[in-house]
């Protein structure tokens, strides 16, 4: 069973297609990077994964996640943890006084606060402790969001998703706003999570594609340009077409990077 199984999926805004006849397959355990330029359709594809939007009707269409075409959004979140920069913004703006423990605990109700009517059992509390320890961020338990760095809050938001023990995690440009040291540290954390869960990385940063990612999906102008082994697709020729830039790609110790730009 494929974790993600899309065929003939299109999405339109105001009658105009922004995703065209998408065919996409991702197996469980198949760590995948979805790469494309800004405006290529990555964000729209991400909303399809989360069921925040729905595709245009097509009798040939198949849109299945974990083998199901219809999901209750709340139930889907238990299987598929999605980490976006919007989540980071929402917590920063709406709940600056929450601490790391509370951010993680809020995942059980998918809320941005802890409310009096919410009931938490000793098992919930224990699970939060276990996740914080697994991510090595127990020191953030009592630290308020307003005092956290960008990377610290992002780790707490990942912890929030992990309380459900999802089968897979989708990370949307996870190192945006992090300095070089924090980027390295964060990618190491994601690699640790990848030992137990499928990772789907949505990005336009080649440097975020870590070693365990074997499959790459290249998206260009709302269409899947190519899907396959990263060693075959992360080349000068393919990335030049996808990003409309004369890129020269380097690879060292399994990590890819833009070596230079120009003919």
Model-derived regions, located:
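Conserved structural motif at the start of ABC-family nucleotide-binding domains
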Residues: 4, 18-21, 141
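Conserved ABC ATPase "signature" region
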Residues: 105, 120-140
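A short, proline-enriched helix->beta-strand linker immediately N-terminal to the Walker B motif
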Residues: 163-167
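Catalytic Walker B motif of ABC-type/P-loop ATPase nucleotide-binding domains
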Residues: 169-173
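A short, surface-exposed alpha-helical micro-motif characterized by mixed small hydrophobic
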Residues: 209-211
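H-loop (His-switch) and adjacent beta-strand-loop-beta switch element
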Residues: 215-229
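ABC ATPase nucleotide-binding domains
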Residues: 236-263
């Amino acid at each position: 069973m494929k974790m993600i199984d899309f065929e003939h999926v299109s999405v339109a805004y105001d009658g105009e297609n922004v995703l065209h006849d998408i065919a996409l397959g991702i197996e469980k355990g198949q760590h995948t990077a979805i790469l494309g330029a800004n405006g290529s359709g990555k964000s729209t594809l991400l909303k399809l994964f989360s069921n925040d939007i729905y595709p245009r009707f097509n009798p040939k269409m198949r849109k299945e996640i974990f083998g199901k075409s219809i999901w209750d959004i709340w139930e889907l979140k238990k299987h598929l943890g999605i980490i976006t920069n919007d989540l980071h913004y929402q917590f920063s703006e709406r709940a600056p006084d929450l601490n790391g423990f509370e951010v993680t605990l809020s995942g059980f109700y998918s809320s941005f606060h802890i409310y009096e009517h919410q009931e938490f059992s000793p098992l919930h509390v224990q699970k939060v402790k276990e996740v914080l320890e697994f991510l090595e961020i127990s020191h953030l338990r009592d630290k308020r969001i307003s005092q956290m760095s960008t990377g610290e809050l992002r780790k707490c938001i990942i912890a929030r998703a992990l309380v459900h023990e999802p089968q897979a995690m989708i990370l949307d440009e996870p190192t945006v706003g992090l300095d070089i040291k924090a980027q390295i540290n964060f990618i190491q954390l994601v690699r640790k999570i990848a030992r137990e869960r499928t990772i789907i990385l949505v990005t336009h940063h080649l440097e975020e594609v870590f070693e365990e990612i074997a499959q790459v999906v290249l998206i260009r102008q709302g269409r899947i340009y190519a899907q396959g082994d990263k060693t075959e697709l992360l080349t000068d020729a393919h990335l030049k077409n996808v990003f409309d830039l004369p890129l020269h790609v380097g690879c060292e110790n399994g990590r890819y990077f833009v070596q230079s730009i120009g003919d």
